[in-house]
Amino acid sequence: MTRRSFNVTKAFLGKYDELSYENLLENQANRLRALVQSEFKDPFDVFFAPSGSDLVYYPLMFQMMLNPNKRLLNIVSCPEELGSGSKFASETRFYANYNQFGDKIEKGAFVDPKNTSEVHYLDARDAEGNILDRTAAINELIANNPDASVVGSLVFGSKSGIKDDLNVIDTDSETMWVVDLCQFRVDHSLIHDLLEKGVMVMLTGSKFFQAPPFCAAMLVPRKWSERLKQVDASIIEPYGALFSAYDVPWFMENMREHLPQKENKALRLRWEIALD
């Protein structure tokens, strides 16, 4: 921890008991929005999570809410670039033995055995180590699964610098596109372009903002959050083992009613350091 981070921590903990948790959440979301927003004020909402791996669950939960009776197809690009936790999450499994509240969960077990994802991993490289073009494979999977609700999980600026061809994103389709920018090796303008296209963006405070590990956020374009807030969200109740009602925006009442109202003081502190 740097001296600056130590001072932020000391000040934050000293006043924490006087703060409204709900107001603190909104304040941090607004500060994050101000950091990444363009001059055109891209309309998006902030969904918090305790780690980058937890962010992987969000689009899967969203598609379950919007299409509860459809197969859930998760197309995951560059699995070699992902941590083991993100792979478990991509398969709608618990990726750890404890959740953000310290409760014991079963690593590797399905979060909800009744609603699971069908995952297609698309390798980043061939056997000789050459970077593969995954665009054709992504398009083929989507075309061959018209009966499925689809999540397209792409990377851009990965740990080894791999970048998916973002032209594969079809803004007119019902595919829910997500781009992992957790490493944040990109220009700010890319975030604005993605949000404008309706693409969800994954960020982690520990990478881009140089904060302590385990603080993450999903930037969700308003086109999705407006639809999500109007549907039955009871299908996500099992994800109360991972998320708090406070992780989602205040106006997502349909989601909040199926998640526990648990505060995470440490997560708020990590974001406070990240946003300082």
Where on the chain are the PLM-derived regions?
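Conserved N-terminal alpha-helix of the aminotransferase class I/II PLP-enzyme fold
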Residues: 2-54, 58-70, 79, 88, ...
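Substrate-binding/gating loop at the entrance of the active-site cleft, primarily
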Residues: 74-117
